């Protein structure tokens, strides 16, 4: 945004959608080519078509079945602020991933409820540096459970499973903040000097081959019509 029309970049990619909105509000995007928009489900792109999602990550509750029976799983992300969850779950609060989850709580529950949830979280959870560290701690039985993105466990399972073999995933439902899906996005900058190539790249990364490559590396996907 600070570079504005002077940016030397052709394509803007970001991990979380709020950054896409900032650039879009500054009117720095060129419209995405119609052929690219057709590859992305309408739920994963704004109606005006200035940018598209290139990946989606689902918030999940990872737990160690040896320490936490399924009957005791939380019904909602908000439950984790309750006293019965003190010392029983972990998260990585410093990263953009968890900040996006908090933003979902704010959007769905409001400022007062979010503040109370954060106070309860502070009392109850254990902080880790990164989602991988949370997964490893749950797997090792150091803590009962944690809040991460799905692809950390999927990625480990696709390799050796060494850091996830003692874990399972629980998905929150019914418009719960814990059912939050974070979008990585991409758009062509209006200042690009190579717009044709930039549009071609965006079409590839949202297409079958680009999505297959992302799925193989990161277990991330976006919605494709049909």
Could you describe each region identified by the protein language model?
Residues 184-226:
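Mature extracytoplasmic/periplasmic domains
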Residues 18-22, 145-166:
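A ligand-binding cleft/hinge motif common to bilobed small-molecule-binding domains
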Residues 61, 179-181, 195:
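Binding-cleft/active-site segments that stabilize strongly anionic ligands or cofactors
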Residues 1-2, 6-143:
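Extracytoplasmic ligand-binding site segments that recognize negatively charged/polar headgroups
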Residues 96-97, 134, 145, 151-155, ...:
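Short, catalytically relevant binding-site loops at active-site mouths
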Residues 39-43, 57, 117-121, 126-128, ...:
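Periplasmic-binding protein-like
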């Amino acid at each position: 945004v600070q570079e504005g029309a002077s940016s030397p970049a052709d394509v803007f990619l970001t991990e979380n959608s709020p950054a896409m909105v900032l650039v879009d509000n500054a009117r720095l995007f060129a419209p995405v080519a119609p052929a690219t928009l057709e590859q992305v489900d309408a739920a994963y792109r704004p109606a005006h078509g200035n940018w598209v999602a290139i990946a989606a990550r689902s918030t999940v509750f990872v737990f160690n079945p040896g320490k936490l029976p399924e009957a005791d799983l939380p019904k909602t992300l908000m439950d984790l602020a309750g006293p019965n969850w003190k010392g029983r779950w972990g998260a990585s609060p410093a990263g953009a991933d968890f900040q996006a989850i908090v933003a979902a709580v704010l959007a769905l529950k409001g400022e007062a409820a979010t503040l109370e949830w954060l106070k309860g979280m502070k009392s109850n959870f254990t902080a880790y540096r990164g989602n991988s560290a949370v997964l490893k701690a749950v797997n090792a039985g150091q803590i009962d459970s944690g809040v991460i993105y799905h692809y950390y466990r999927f990625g480990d399972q696709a390799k050796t499973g060494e850091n996830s073999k003692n874990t399972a995933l629980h998905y929150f439902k019914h418009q719960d903040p814990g059912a939050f899906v974070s979008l990585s996005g991409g758009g062509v900058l209006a200042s690009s000097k190579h717009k044709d190539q930039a549009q071609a790249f965006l079409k590839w990364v949202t297409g079958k081959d680009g999505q297959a490559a992302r799925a193989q590396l990161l277990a991330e996907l976006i919605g494709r019509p049909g």
